[in-house]
From Swiss-Prot:
Keyword Transcription belongs to the record: no
Name of the protein this chain belongs to: Sulfate adenylyltransferase subunit 2
Reactions accelerated catalytically: sulfate + ATP + H(+) = adenosine 5'-phosphosulfate + diphosphate
Ranges in a coiled coil: none
Keyword Nucleotidyltransferase: yes
Subunit (UniProt): Heterodimer composed of CysD, the smaller subunit, and CysN.
Amino acid sequence: MDQKRLTHLRQLEAESIHIIREVAAEFSNPVMMYSIGKDSSVMLHLARKAFYPGTLPFPLLHVDTGWKFREMYEFRDRTAKAYGCELLVHKNPEGVAMGINPFVHGSAKHTDIMKTEGLKQALDKYGFDAAFGGARRDEEKSRAKERIYSFRDRFHRWDPKNQRPELWHNYNGQINKGESIRVFPLSNWTEQDIWQYIWLENIEIVPLYLAAERPVLERDGMLMMIDDDRIDLQPGEVIKKRMVRFRTLGCWPLTGAVESSAQTLPEIIEEMLVSTTSERQGRVIDRDQAGSMELKKRQGYF
């Protein structure tokens, strides 16, 4: 990696660490959202750097839908234990009682009940006034226009037309009781930055990001990896072993794999540099309707 690129990564690192420390100093009850993906792994690494040699002054929160890949759950528990982090896991009890799942109820309803409502329940339950998230501006157009300090009202709603100015790295965290701030320390990072930083810092990631032979089937233009037996095959569908990996991770029925032979970080970086598609092309929830991500964020989604 050339010196110019290395300096760029260190500038991003310094900015993110500054934001994380600022939130810890300014808010009374912050939390770090932990979705187990590559961005969460980088954000957690930066937080550990920010407070080294001490422990994190806030817990990790995973809003569990019950449909993550098994390797993600294993990685989550192992990581929290290894780093001595307080891990809070919340699953929407109403959604569980209703038996909500992406196959029967569809991606939009599943996401709304198990993720958006689950997140709002958890934030209210613990009274968090600031929540870190690993979203980046290059991922999706609604995220591109969101501030680093993203104000949410007492109903957790985001108004993109009423955002606070952020001049010269000055962030406005003033809130009233019941309101909160979503904080995005990785806003100015790109997918390329994330992968090169993971390689530079030797950050552990979920093995699903690396190519391997996995059982998949084609459905709705997506390669779906079959992670357990909670699926009913449709006529003509056949499960086959194919060499695939994931560019983004979520609920396994809603996350498409990509055919790939990249089994190392340098190979992933090389593959990504020539890719002409978004990393979120495999996320079914982004296709629900036009502007679906912005609508979800207005309703309280991260």
